[in-house]
Amino acid sequence: MFEGAMPALITPFTKDDRIDREGLQRNIAFVEEGGVSGIVPCGTTGESATLSAAEHEEVIDIAVECSKVPVIAGTGSNNTGEALQFTKHAADAGVDGVLLISPYYNKPNPAGLLAHFKKIAEAVDIPMILYNVPSRTGQDMPVDVIVELAKVENIVGIKEASGNAAKVSQILENTMDDDFVVLSGEDGLTLPIISMGGRGVISVAANIVPDKMSGMVNAALKGDYETARKLHFEIAPLIRALFLETNPIPVKKAAELVGLASGHLRLPLAPISDANQAKLANELRKLGVME
């Protein structure tokens, strides 16, 4: 179920700082038309850190109501009880799976990581994808912890955003017998990860160019690396531009520039600089998605 290109959705806000329900629905329809295989609301790209609990649930509810593709909801937290609460709501709402970031700031030891994820997995019977992103959490999940969690029946995969291809290879090597899916958490490393046995990407760029990201991933999964490489290099400059500043600052501006629903960023994130906006706009024009 969990393979292909799946955008980590931005969360559009209205001028009075509410969830832009209609805008979110339009954005979901746009990426679906672009061929994505799933959507991921309430991740880092969706500004989950500044959503209230009620808003978190609202975004997930909207996604489930209108999506025609599988929904993987971000339900992680550095508070195990809160992560469990979010996960229970997502399961009740009808999502197809959940994405659980490793606890940030706390920096739990390996025993704590195992206990955190196992507690949630035992309490809620839904497919769960781990999320390793040390640049955000301050901690890189050890391979042996990931391998042990892969043996838990409803922990079915990981979004790997460590930027370490050797580590990804080690995870794949040690989970091949566990029916465990490895997804890239970095757009620029998606193609090499698929070449090692990864099954797709949870993507920032797919918010803006879902057709090209889906085309690249699908070609690679079919073994058509000539087409996949061509698309990879075509969108690589945009991917770099989308990370000129902290995600999701550039992607929300890109969404605005191409006519998607976006709205403001919530503090403490501030708008993109004029210089970086110009660079971003230049890449959007090169791809023909902005006039």
UniProtKB/Swiss-Prot annotation:
Q: Which CDD domains match?
A: DHDPS
| Superkingdom of the source species | Archaea
From the UniProt record, give the pathway where this protein acts. Amino-acid biosynthesis; L-lysine biosynthesis via DAP pathway; (S)-tetrahydrodipicolinate from L-aspartate: step 3/4
User: To which species is this protein native?
Assistant: Methanosarcina mazei (strain ATCC BAA-159 / DSM 3647 / Goe1 / Go1 / JCM 11833 / OCM 88) (Methanosarcina frisia)
One GO term under biological process is:
diaminopimelate biosynthetic process
Q: Which UniProt keywords apply?
A: Amino-acid biosynthesis, Cytoplasm, Diaminopimelate biosynthesis, Lyase, Lysine biosynthesis, Schiff base
Return the PANTHER family for the record. 4-HYDROXY-2-OXOGLUTARATE ALDOLASE, MITOCHONDRIAL, DIHYDRODIPICOLINATE SYNTHASE
GO MF terms held by the record: 2-dehydro-3-deoxy-phosphogluconate aldolase activity; 4-hydroxy-tetrahydrodipicolinate synthase activity
Q: What is its main location?
A: cytoplasm
Q: Which family does it belong to?
A: Belongs to the DapA family.
The protein's matches in InterPro entries, at most eight in alphabetical order, are given as: Aldolase_TIM, DapA, DapA-like, Schiff_base-form_aldolases_AS, Schiff_base-form_aldolases_CS
Q: What is this protein called?
A: 4-hydroxy-tetrahydrodipicolinate synthase
Any signal peptide, and if so, which residues?
A: none
Q: Which residues form the active site?
A: 131 (proton donor/acceptor), 159 (schiff-base intermediate with substrate)
Gene Ontology cellular component terms for the protein in this record: cytoplasm
Q: Where does pyruvate bind?
A: 45, 202
State its Enzyme Commission number(s): 4.3.3.7
Identify the enzyme class.
lyase
Question: What does the function comment of this entry state?
Answer: Catalyzes the condensation of (S)-aspartate-beta-semialdehyde [(S)-ASA] and pyruvate to 4-hydroxy-tetrahydrodipicolinate (HTPA).
